[in-house]
Regions:
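Structural preference for solvent-exposed beta-strand-turn elements
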Residues: 1-192
C-alpha cells in the first residue's frame, strides 16, 4: 500500500459546490439537487480530488475556479475528454483551472492515453530483471523522471514521441535515491 489517502479534500470541495455529504457506517453518501460554482482552494495537491471536482463543476451552475489543482497529465486528459463532451474548461495542467458549468454533456469518442504508471512499472521490472522491453503508445514526456532514474540504475533507454525502449545489460542495477513529488517529478504511485 502507498499509505493513507484521505478524502477530506474531495468532500470539502463537494460541500462548497453545494453537495450534502453524509458519512454512514463507513460509507460516504453524497447528494445534491443542484451544484453551484465556487472557488475551491485545495490545501494540498490531490489528483483524484481535482478530477472529481472538475467533473462535478462542469455541470454546476456558474463558474468554478480550482486553485492548487493537480497538474498531472491525467488532469489534462480528463479535461480534453470533458471538453469533447461539451464542458468548458481552461487551465488544465496548471495550478488554476477555470470551469464554466454547462447544462449537460454529450456523447463522445476519446482515445485513452497509455497509463504512465503501468509503463513505468514494466520499465522498472525490465531493469531489475536484466531485461529488454519496448513500450509503444506511450508519451515519454510523461515519464522523464522515471527514465532519468532508470538510466542512473544502469539501463540503456531510447525513446521516440510514442515509444520507450529499455535494455538492461548490467548484472545488477546501480542504487538509486528516489524522492516522490507531484508531476513532473517522480510519481508517488511508482514507489508501491
Amino acid at each position: 500500500a502507498i499509505g493513507t489517502r484521505p478524502v477530506n479534500f474531495h468532500l470539502d470541495a463537494l460541500k462548497k459546490l453545494g453537495a450534502k455529504i453524509v458519512l454512514k457506517n463507513g460509507y460516504i453518501e453524497a447528494s445534491a439537487k443542484k451544484l453551484i460554482g465556487t472557488n475551491i482552494n485545495f490545501e494540498g495537491i490531490t489528483v483524484t480530488g481535482t478530477e472529481n471536482i472538475m467533473m462535478a463543476a462542469t455541470l454546476a451552475e456558474g463558474r468554478t475556479i480550482i486553485k492548487n489543482a493537480a497538474k498531472e497529465p491525467e488532469i489534462i486528459d480528463l479535461a480534453n475528454m470533458l471538453v469533447s463532451m461539451g464542458a468548458k474548461i481552461n487551465g488544465a495542467g496548471n495550478d488554476t483551472i477555470i470551469i464554466d458549468g454547462v447544462n449537460n454533456w454529450t456523447g463522445t469518442e476519446f482515445d485513452i492515453p497509455a497509463d504512465r504508471i503501468e509503463a513505468g512499472t514494466y520499465l522498472t521490472a525490465a531493469t531489475v530483471t536484466k531485461g529488454e522491453i519496448k513500450i509503444e503508445g506511450i508519451n515519454p514526456e510523461r515519464l522523464m523522471k522515471v527514465i532519468e532514474k532508470l538510466k542512473t540504475a544502469g539501463a540503456t533507454i531510447s525513446y521516440t514521441s510514442s515509444s520507450i525502449s529499455l535494455n538492461m545489460k548490467r548484472e545488477y542495477p546501480n542504487p538509486v535515491n528516489i524522492t516522490t513529488a507531484p508531476f513532473p517529478d517522480f510519481p508517488t504511485d511508482m514507489q508501491a
